[in-house]
A protein has these predicted regions:
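Extracytoplasmic gate region of multi-pass secondary transporters
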Residues: 32, 214-265, 355, 359
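Extracellular/periplasmic helix-loop-helix junction of adjacent transmembrane segments
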Residues: 34-66
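Conserved MFS/SLC helix-loop-helix module at the cytosolic interface between two early adjacent transmembrane helices
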Residues: 66-102
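Helix-to-loop junctions at the C-terminal end of transmembrane segments
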Residues: 68-79, 268-280
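Cytoplasmic membrane-interface "Motif A"-like loop-to-helix N-cap segments
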Residues: 77-87, 136, 277-289
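Helix-breaking motifs and short loop linkers at transmembrane-helix boundaries and internal kinks
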Residues: 79, 100-106, 134, 279, ...
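C-terminal ends and interior cores of transmembrane alpha-helices
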Residues: 89-102, 290-304
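Helix-loop-helix hairpin linking two adjacent transmembrane segments in secondary transporters
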Residues: 145-184
Length: 408
């Protein structure tokens, strides 16, 4: 890569999007890390910890689902920058207030509001980066954003170990407000501004559903990511419960999140560079879905003896589902400029929202099976759906993004 390409790759939109996603991941995963100490401080019994945790993560995920639609439409109607400013302000303030809650219901309300705010960050950032970089660098740019962003999980774990859970939320909110100031120097996407001048219909959410070819691609984009949030939302979030079922003591959710996200960041680097090398998004995703199946089975049934061995399993879980950046890039590349933000923002949040039915399915199966068997059935289900969904999307590696979605 020559010096000109490197300069384009490390441009202000890419750096700001990467730092924004870093704070977004910190705030998004902080709940998984501080779930047990925060609920304990509110008087929740250990026997209720899993059920109350599922209630709170559902509230956050429903917020993400709703926020994905709101911010996605806004990104196409008002511009990518409006989302980058509005979303970070909402989730930063929500997280600061979250540090003051005293009841589980207050906690749920704040996770819901924070979820709405968190929904806008990644889609708007990836859309802006995809439209700002030349085709040959697009995959590298989105990979850089995701890899830097995912390391926010490492910071969240460090902060949660160093401070109490309330201060961890205050710090997350403060980081977001600081980042808000840095966004003043970012310019709007040139591709979007050209479309805005043309006066075409933009951000029409229903356009994703009114033609079979678009709807098919939209559903395919969502469902290829199903294993990613099954791993994060169930296997990692409830890792202390899985470790207990395996007879392993001393597993801390924060460490499980950290190691899985280090794996996820490594996977994103590998999948990003692999897709550039083989010049195919779909072939790379196929390989990583296959790896996910192997690592999910190993995590649940490998005879781990120690917590360090268990954390190694968490790392490989993350590595297997390390096609998150590719997943969001594919969503951005499938659709025209007038629908790109809507698609790229709703797709990752719809898949995050899939944690809601997946946790219900997991809970239902736990009533008649043990926790490991229930998790394996849900996991195999997500893998099968993802393989099928891969057939519904286009190969977009070399696609020029300067085009529109039209109904006529």
């Amino acid at each position: 890569m020559d010096s000109r390409s490197l300069k384009q790759l490390f441009s202000i939109p890419v750096i700001v999007a990467a730092l924004g996603y870093f704070v977004d991941i910190y705030d998004l995963l902080l709940f998984s890390i501080v779930r047990i100490p925060s609920l304990r401080s509110m008087g929740v019994a250990d026997s209720e910890m899993l059920a109350q945790g599922e209630y709170l993560i559902r509230a956050q995920m429903i917020g993400l689902l709703l926020g994905g639609i709101i911010w996605g439409i806004m990104g196409d109607k008002r511009g990518r920058l409006s989302v980058l400013f509005g979303s970070i302000l909402l989730y930063s303030l929500a997280n600061i207030v979250n540090g003051l809650v005293t009841t589980v219901d207050q906690y749920a309300l704040l996770r819901f509001i924070a979820g709405i705010g968190l929904a806008g960050e990644l889609g708007a950032g990836i859309t802006l980066v995809s439209e700002s970089l030349p085709t040959r660098l697009r995959g590298y740019g989105t990979t850089l954003v995701a890899t830097v962003g995912l390391m926010g999980a490492v910071l969240a774990n460090y902060v949660a170990k160093t401070f109490d859970w309330q201060m961890a939320y205050f710090i997350g909110g403060g980081l977001g407000l600081i980042l808000l100031v840095t966004r003043i120097s970012v310019f709007e996407s040139g591709i979007f501004l050209k479309v805005k001048e043309q006066g075409v219909d933009r951000g029409n959410f229903l356009q994703l559903f009114n033609r079979w070819d678009r709807f098919k691609k939209f559903m395919g984009c969502i469902l290829i990511g199903l294993p990613i949030w099954y791993v994060i939302g169930i296997l990692i979030t409830f890792s202390p419960e899985f470790a207990k079922a395996m007879g392993i003591a001393g597993v801390v959710a924060g460490d499980a999140v950290m190691y899985s996200y280090i794996g996820l960041a490594a996977g994103d680097l590998l999948s990003g560079f692999a897709s550039q090398a083989v010049r195919s998004r779909k072939k790379t995703v196929f390989v990583f879905i296959l790896l996910s199946l192997v690592f999910i089975t190993a995590y649940l049934y490998w005879p781990f003896q120690t917590s360090s061995g268990f954390y190694t399993g968490c790392f490989f879980l993350g590595l297997g589902v390390g096609y998150w950046a590719l997943f969001v890039t594919i969503a951005a590349e499938q659709f025209g400029t007038n629908l790109r933000s809507t698609a790229a923002t709703t797709v990752p949040n719809f898949i995050r929202g899939s944690v809601v039915p997946l946790t219900f399915m997991f809970g239902y199966l736990r009533a008649s099976l043990n926790i490991l068997q229930a998790a394996l059935i849900v996991g195999v289900f997500t893998i099968m759906i993802a393989f099928w969904a891969l057939r519904l999307i286009d190969e977009t590696f070399s696609r020029d993004l300067n085009y529109l979605e039209k109904d006529h």
